[in-house]
Amino acid sequence: MSKKRLHEIAKEIGKSSKEVVEHAKYLGLDVKSHASSVEEADAKKIISSFSKASKPDVTASQTVKPKEVAQPSVTVVKETGSEHAEKTQVSKPKSRNFKAEREARAKEQAARKQANGSSHRSQERRGGYRQPNNHQTNEQGDKRITHRSQGDTNDKRIERKASNVSPRHDNHQLVGDRNRSFAKENHKNGRFTNQKKQGRQEPQSKSPKIDFKARAAALKAEQNAEYSRQSETRFRAQQEAKRLAELARQEAKEAALKAQAEEMSHREAALKSIEEAETKLKSSNISAKSTADNRRKKQARPEKNRELTHHSQEGQKKNKKSWNSQNQVRNQKNSNWNKNKKTKKGKNVKNTNTAPKPVTERKFHELPKEFEYTEGMTVAEIAKRIKREPAEIVKKLFMMGVMATQNQSLDGDTIELLMVDYGIEAKAKVEVDDADIERFFEDENYLNPENIVERAPVVTIMGHVDHGKTTLLDTLRNSRVATGEAGGITQHIGAYQIEEAGKKITFLDTPGHAAFTSMRARGASVTDITILIVAADDGVMPQTIEAINHSKAAGVPIIVAINKIDKPGANPERVIAELAEYGIISTAWGGDSEFVEISAKFNKNIDELLETVLLVAEVEELKADPTVRAIGTVIEARLDKGKGAIATLLVQQGTLHVQDPIVVGNTFGRVRAMVNDLGRRVKSAEPSTPVSITGLNETPMAGDHFAVYADEKAARAAGEERSKRALLKQRQNTQRVSLDNLFDTLKAGEIKTVNVIIKADVQGSVEALAASLVKIDVEGVRVNVVHSAVGAINESDVTLAEASNAVIIGFNVRPTPQARQQADTDDVEIRLHSIIYKVIEEVEEAMKGKLDPVYQEKILGEAIIRETFKVSKVGTIGGFMVINGKVTRDSSVRVIRDSVVIFDGKLASLKHYKDDVKEVGNAQEGGLMIENFNDLKVDDTIEAYIMEEIVRK
């Protein structure tokens, strides 16, 4: 029998795949996902169950009425067997009455027990309810029912012949027809195995026919009702427990607040009593002081008179007054003057004789329940927030052992201890970093749950070289992308959208795995689905394995497209088996990866591939909120001579509009213009839509996140702050020499470097080229990327190259005329390329040229000293004979005596007899003299050699 997949059934009946999978599991079928296959009978069962679910349930209503009027006698059935009675029995009640059904079943069982006895009931139970674990009992019950039905059929034939009544109007025949239909239905469901027993009837004279389907449905409904009652009881118990727990928490909180209020009232009463005592003490001191002043005033004039009389009697001492007397006179005079001034002019002069004014009481402010603080708050700021005097807080801090003034900053721990002493709950204020745009991607509260809608999937196509990735992309674009402007020319911006079955799919055109890896390193997970292309004739290749690892690291589902099935050597089964070794298992083998056999060249099964993409996207349930401010990721960036920085963005959440203030990576700006993948200007971009924008002040990096801010001022502040942080981080990465890394620094000083400046057309090419050059492995030499940027080669690049002794590499760009002229003047080398492999080879050759030459020793020959001659003012001359090879004039020699090297040096002269020669061959004799060595002896061995340079590979 043929099989069907669940998503095909869902498409046929117009239901979602998720509903069909759940319904199949409910029917007891062993399925795992939308790709699981079922038999044709099971498929019909699923379709019929969906059609029954959409229609009113007539079966359950039919089973209630007949059971209430069922009688064991056959004659009663004949009396009540009219067509009108049948119609009334089939009519559907308005509502189910489970109590009435249970009473009807009880009456039916009692009647059956009286008529047939317990044996019939046991047989009926065994025949009516199939027990899966007891097949033998079911077969025996079926045989008994068949024998009874055969006898009853013979009786009815005799009755029909005698009465000449048509079997169509016979009530017994109606019951038989029902039994036959019921037996056929049971045969379809696999309940009876003997085909001869299907058309036979159960005798109505002994027991009425039982509608097993109706009874099963009724029991199922009753079980569901009981389960719902239990669930409701359990839910109510949980709600009651929650309510009691909440009530207990509220009571505990109220008790704590009450205790705190009582403590505060006691503290306030104590403070009030202290203030009253201080007020009384001050008033008593003031009254005592005023009394003493009045007493001194009364005694002041007599003292003056006595003093004046005393001085007048002394003669010469008349004009000499003591210092105390002068002060007394002056004070008295001043007091009288003030007194007269007050009485004459009515000035409000303080009178010491009046009673003191009452001290004004300070207005009492309640302490706050919570206090939100920031690190570094001063005592004065805290006092103002909690409405207390700074002196009071300083006093409390002093009692806690902290010496502080009202302008001194406090740390968080001290502030918390101070608030605990006041009985206030202290909370640190959470500082929101406006420059951190990553928080929008991590904060779940950023989205509105009621506004979330379905979005288009983002698909990345990966695979080995020459496996058809580019061909598939071209096929999809040419066949599915709508024509653009004049001539159907479209602008390629690194990402594009196609439409299939009324739904959009976004494809990312990320050439090579380097860009994908760099985006993963920065955490830019923008891909929802990966299409892995494998050639049917090549199978799994190294880059295929690399693509599998990248997709698993990204955590995205994989759809395998087996390409080139039109070739003669295609073997899709081998590809499936090889991918299974790396954890990519087909759904046909019980895995979770979809496999589609396609031919991108001949446009074969492309529709099936797109349907699979939409199916996987439906299972993944990709959602987005288009109402919030837009956030997303940079796909590509480049520098245009006329437009400036151009960035290709993929909107992931929210909607991006023209004139929105935006922060992209470490740069900022305002969206000046927005162009879609067809080269048309648009005013807004919804989630999963790729657009190209202008208006940024600098070129961002591929893989950076972007976010829209409320106003341009906030965006500018966030962008400048992010730029400062990036610069500070770059400076912190500079390694300084210490004792720990001294050896590594000295070792690194021995390594030669090749300085390069990289300029390319797009940011992705800059990153890929820089990463490829750094990975070049040449022992003793490394590449140092001095500067890398997007755009043409200008004068500043030439100046930097001259200062750092670097080579400028231009990838798909050209130098300006001024830069070329300056490079010729400053003797700066500029290399222009359009193929990355050529750049790598050229830089590798330059690195090898930086290395010092490596030499290898080559032995030329050996000679034996036969005689020595000592010549004055010249030295020792050795007569030799060559025993192996040759001895040349420009070779170096070693003097070996008793297998020990005595001397190693150059030849001073080489002669054959009396003639100077360039070399002496094998078995020839000659004379030689060695520079700076005269200790030659007979039987010394002379070894001649030269040093040859080794070519590096």
UniProtKB/Swiss-Prot annotation:
Domain tr-type G: 454-623
Region called G1, residue ranges: 463-470
Compositional bias per record (Low complexity), positions renumbered to this chain: 322-338
Biased composition (Polar residues): 191-207, 282-291
Pfam families: EF-G_D2, GTP_EFTU, IF-2, IF2_N
Source superkingdom: Bacteria
Family: Belongs to the TRAFAC class translation factor GTPase superfamily. Classic translation factor GTPase family. IF-2 subfamily.
Entries under PANTHER family matching the protein: TR-TYPE G DOMAIN-CONTAINING PROTEIN, TRANSLATION INITIATION FACTOR IF-2-RELATED
G2: region residues: 488-492
Origin organism lineage: Bacteria, Bacillati, Bacillota, Bacilli, Lactobacillales
Binding positions for GTP per the UniProt entry: 463-470, 509-513, 563-566
Gene (name only): infB
GO molecular function: GTP binding; GTPase activity; translation initiation factor activity
Positions of the UniProt region annotated as Disordered: 48-248, 279-363
Region (G4) residue spans: 563-566
Name assigned to this protein: Translation initiation factor IF-2
Compartments (UniProt record): Cytoplasm
An example Gene Ontology CC term for this record: cytosol
Organism: Streptococcus pyogenes serotype M18 (strain MGAS8232)
Keyword Transcription: no
SUPFAM superfamilies (alphabetical): Initiation factor IF2/eIF5b, domain 3, P-loop containing nucleoside triphosphate hydrolases, Translation proteins
